[in-house]
Each structure stands twice: as structure tokens, then as C-alpha cells.
């Protein structure tokens, strides 16, 4: 799980943050190691000994995702991963999440950035106060301008 507010341990180093998330997957497999997440996120690899409190918002988001991957999940839950990030960082994040999906990792995304969500999602579900008000594809959603306006403001 990657929470909305990029919860990282600010007094720990990048490497120590990763170690706090390390565990085998449900099937006992260890797919994600520090070396593999550093390959995925070279930006934080260069700062492996820096305390997380010195990282930028984008670097903290990368660290939060990397730490979640260290738990070797079969599903990665992401709550508003693009919130508060610069467009160039959102672009990089989208590329990384797309690569993870192509590797076969299931992503469950709560995201208001329609462009990022469209890039990553096979299916769309819109909830209102816990009730499903729409389920379908982005193409289906595009044919429903009233839903786009009401829930996405477009």
C-alpha cells in the first residue's frame, strides 16, 4: 500500500526505509530486492544513504513505492500517487507504474489525474460515498459527459 501522503520514515536513510518494508511475498518468493528497486528508481539509488527527510516530494513518492514493492506484493495499492508532484515527476511516475503493470503486477489506483489514470487503467470504477456509480472503460466513460463533469470536473 502506498498512502496518499507519502509516509516515509524521515529520520531513516533511504536504504533503512527499504529494509523496513522487506518481506517475502505470499508465496514465499522474494522478487523485489533493494538492487531491483534501485534499478527501477535510480533517483533514489543515488541517495541511498541520505535521510528520507532530505528527499524531494517526487523522491519520497518513489521511496514510498519502492518500500511497498520490497514487500513483494501481488497487488500494489496506490492512493493519489500524483498528488502534489510536478508534471515531469508525474510523467516519470507513469512510466514506472506502466512498466510494473507490464511485468504483471496488478495496480489498484485511486487517482484524480485523468491522464495518468487513463494511461494506467484497464477498468474504471467511480465511487460516491462508498457506492459504485460507474464501472467500465475510459472509452465508456468518455461517452458519459455528465459523469465526467460531475466526478472529474471535465
Where are the regions that the model predicts?
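ABC-type ATPase nucleotide-binding domains, specifically the catalytic core motifs of the NBD
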Residues: 14-32, 40-45, 49, 152-154
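Conserved ABC ATPase signature
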Residues: 51-55
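ABC ATPase C-loop
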Residues: 68-69
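Conserved catalytic motifs of ABC-family nucleotide-binding domains
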Residues: 72
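Catalytic Walker B motif of ABC-type/P-loop ATPase nucleotide-binding domains
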Residues: 76-80
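Helical segment within the ABC ATPase nucleotide-binding domain
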Residues: 91-103
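H-loop/switch region of ABC-family ATPase nucleotide-binding domains
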Residues: 109-112
Amino acid at each position: 500500500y502506498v498512502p496518499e501522503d507519502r509516509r516515509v520514515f524521515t529520520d531513516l536513510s533511504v536504504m533503512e526505509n527499504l529494509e523496513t518494508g522487506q518481506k517475502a511475498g505470499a508465496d514465499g518468493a522474494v522478487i523485489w530486492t533493494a538492487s531491483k528497486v534501485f534499478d527501477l528508481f535510480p533517483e533514489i539509488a543515488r541517495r541511498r544513504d541520505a535521510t528520507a527527510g532530505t528527499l524531494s516530494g517526487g523522491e519520497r513518492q518513489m521511496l514510498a513505492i519502492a518500500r511497498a514493492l520490497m514487500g513483494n506484493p501481488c497487488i500494489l495499492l496506490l492512493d493519489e500517487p500524483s498528488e502534489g508532484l510536478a508534471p515531469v515527476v508525474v510523467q516519470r511516475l507513469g512510466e514506472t507504474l506502466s512498466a510494473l503493470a507490464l511485468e504483471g503486477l496488478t495496480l489498484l489506483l485511486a487517482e484524480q489525474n485523468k491522464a495518468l489514470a487513463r494511461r494506467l487503467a484497464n477498468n474504471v470504477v467511480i465511487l460516491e460515498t462508498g457506492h459504485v456509480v460507474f464501472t467500465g472503460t475510459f472509452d465508456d466513460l468518455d461517452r458519459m459527459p455528465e459523469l465526467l463533469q460531475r466526478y472529474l470536473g471535465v
